[in-house]
């Protein structure tokens, strides 16, 4: 009789421990990866943006080398986003949108916490200067002036 009672008690404790283990998510399940945290930051940028189109992750800088694995401590992030063809009012996820040809590119920096439940995002994004477009325009402009300089003697570029 004593053995049966101990057996029932052990069975109840085992059941309670099993239920408790299933009810409480593990700490590793609550931590986001660096990339997942950045994708959340991009989503937040799109939600708060007044831009006409959605932006999508273009390039992600490598995560900083840190020993601290605590998901509640802010981690620095740096990444670039590019304008897509999808309007901001669309319900389509930005990751499913194609990049817009000659779309704006923005550099984003800030901090994120990797906690999936209480994650905090503090990121700002600024438009990158379009150096490539300016160089192409300048070359075409110089070429045009070289063609016109014999016709108009006042126009001479060195």
Curated annotation (Swiss-Prot):
One MF term in the entry's GO annotations: lipopolysaccharide binding
GO terms, biological process: antimicrobial humoral immune response mediated by antimicrobial peptide; defense response to fungus; defense response to Gram-negative bacterium; defense response to Gram-positive bacterium; innate immune response; killing of cells of another organism
Keyword hit for Phosphoprotein: no
Cellular localisation: Secreted
Cellular component per GO, a single term: extracellular space
Keyword field contains Disulfide bond: yes
Disulfide bond residue pairs: 86-97, 108-125
InterPro entries, per the entry: Cathelicidin-like, Cathelicidin_CS, Cystatin_sf
Keyword list, A-Z: Antibiotic, Antimicrobial, Disulfide bond, Fungicide, Secreted, Signal
Domain of life where this protein originates: Eukaryota
Cross-referenced PANTHER family: CATHELICIDIN, CATHELICIDIN ANTIMICROBIAL PEPTIDE
Function description: Exerts a potent antimicrobial activity against Gram-negative and Gram-positive bacteria, including methicillin-resistant Staphylococcus aureus, and fungi.
Family indicated by similarity: Belongs to the cathelicidin family.
Entry protein name: Cathelicidin-6
Organism of derivation: Bos taurus
């Amino acid at each position: 009789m004593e053995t049966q009672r101990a057996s029932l008690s052990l069975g109840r404790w085992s059941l309670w421990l099993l239920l408790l283990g299933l009810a409480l998510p593990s700490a590793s399940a609550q931590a986001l990866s660096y990339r997942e945290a950045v994708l959340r930051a991009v989503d937040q940028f799109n939600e708060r943006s007044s831009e006409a189109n959605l932006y999508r992750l273009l390039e992600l800088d490598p995560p900083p080398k840190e020993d601290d694995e605590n998901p509640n401590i802010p981690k620095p992030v740096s990444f670039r986003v590019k304008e897509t063809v999808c309007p901001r009012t669309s319900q389509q996820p930005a990751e499913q949108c194609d990049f817009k040809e000659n779309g704006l590119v923005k550099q984003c920096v800030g901090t994120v916490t990797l906690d999936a439940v209480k994650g905090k995002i503090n990121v700002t994004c600024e438009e990158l200067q379009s150096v490539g477009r300016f160089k192409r325009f300048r070359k075409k402009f110089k070429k045009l002036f070289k063609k016109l300089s014999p016709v108009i003697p006042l126009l001479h570029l060195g």
